[in-house]
């Protein structure tokens, strides 16, 4: 029956530890040597496919996570993707063919695919879904009816009451009775269908609102019951349902990790991070999924977001360097309206245009993916801090990172366990020499980092990260030769909205992968005449404009305009 009594719910919980372990052996950390996931929030499947080839594979990302692929409620808001109408692959991000092509393309690039999976509830309201399926609340023809829902039709109101959390409706969304055999079978069928197309793992949305034993039963029905799962179970002090209940089924997302990073970066000391992780009360490292932000928390404000500038970037650098959990790198789009859906309905023509932030491609972040892969299995060594906001540490004899979150530059000779030789600081593409004692000297500007690893032993024309943007249909390809010091970056701005309308804060960052040539392709309408200039920014936000008059150019009637410039001092 649809109703789960309180006694039954408690009985399920009492047996959850045994049931979860017995039915579905844990698969926590993603298998393989590459455990970083790029979370491409609301990117359509064609754009994800291209990104796997152009950036994610070459940068060393092990996984890409895509937003929910199933048919969903119509509407321009992002959250419509999280209101299923059916389990057909027919959402705003692409159809079954596009989904399969994306998986195959990503696999060819060496990137596995995780699908965000909404199995706790169905869509609210009534109408026609994105794939043409008619529905009304509690009635989803051919899939579920009212008897498949939990009997509590009220909105969750008491997180200290387990039955209320797991049997009532999350923000009025019809709550599936995951204790029913029919419901379990339908959910397993959906996940098996995705797996048949090549999906390698699943993020289980709203896992805390389903009993752990129910999820273990569903997982046991999968063709591969050991498939990678990552469960969203938000920690709340004093709540009836604890994220640790779900550790038997896979990675559990450790929300306290992101909240603690925000608190430290914004108001405490980086030196506190010396024992960050389990010693802070976080879940076991090998069963935890970690992140700096996700699509919910960046809007809710309980974690950092792209709007936090250097705090966000340095938190990401630390996360990827520190040996705790399996990291997610969130990559979304700019927003002022928290409900606003993706630009261009999820089509990404080029990074850093149309509001797409592409955090996964920021040099400071993407370069740390190879750092993490190289350092895998190595313990923290050579910890140093100044008792405040400058820290440094090694990962055995494989890697070393220094982070300066002070308000002024830091010059220091750092002691590492690296072999002597020439290295490339992957944060700035700057050569660094480690002497026979394992030492190097560097100056870090405020709010910057230096990162070395044994697989980056020279800076040259070979990109250490993929190109910043894929080709645009029409537009301008900016290529400017400019020298910088650690902490500085080159940007372009101009007299069009796509170029930031001359506002330094909205200028577009170029990629130094082929330093000293900085590159960026920007989509612009064919035939457009525009003015532009390059600027140099440091970590403190100081701006230096290149000298001389505004540069001028015109996009051709078809194709791209290629601009080869030199920064005018």
Curated annotation (Swiss-Prot):
Family statement drawn from the similarity comment of this UniProt entry: Belongs to the glycosyl hydrolase 13 family.
Keyword set includes Disulfide bond: no
Residues the record marks as active site: 205, 232
Record's catalysed reaction(s): Endohydrolysis of (1->4)-alpha-D-glucosidic linkages in polysaccharides containing three or more (1->4)-alpha-linked D-glucose units
PANTHER family: ALPHA-AMYLASE
Family annotation (InterPro entries): A-amylase/branching_C, A-amylase_C, Alpha_amylase, Carb-bd-like_fold, CBM20, Glyco_hydro_13_cat_dom, Glyco_hydro_b, Glycoside_hydrolase_SF
Subunit structure of this chain's protein: Monomer.
Residue intervals of the CBM20 domain: 468-569
CDD domains linked to this entry: AmyAc_bac_euk_AmyA, CBM20_alpha_amylase
BP term (GO), one: carbohydrate metabolic process
Organism: Streptomyces violaceus (Streptomyces venezuelae)
An example molecular function term from Gene Ontology annotations: metal ion binding
Residue numbers binding Ca(2+): 120, 166, 175, 209
Cofactor (UniProt): Ca(2+)
Pfam family, one: Alpha-amylase_C
Keyword terms, alphabetized: Calcium, Carbohydrate metabolism, Glycosidase, Hydrolase, Metal-binding, Signal
Positions bearing the site annotation: Transition state stabilizer: 296
Keyword DNA-binding annotated: no
SUPFAM superfamilies the UniProt entry points to: (Trans)glycosidases (SSF51445), Glycosyl hydrolase domain (SSF51011), Starch-binding domain-like (SSF49452)
Name of the top EC class for this enzyme: hydrolase
Residues annotated as signal peptide: 1-28
Record lineage: Bacteria, Bacillati, Actinomycetota, Actinomycetes, Kitasatosporales
Record EC number: 3.2.1.1
Protein name: Alpha-amylase
Binding note for cofactor: Binds 1 Ca(2+) ion per subunit.
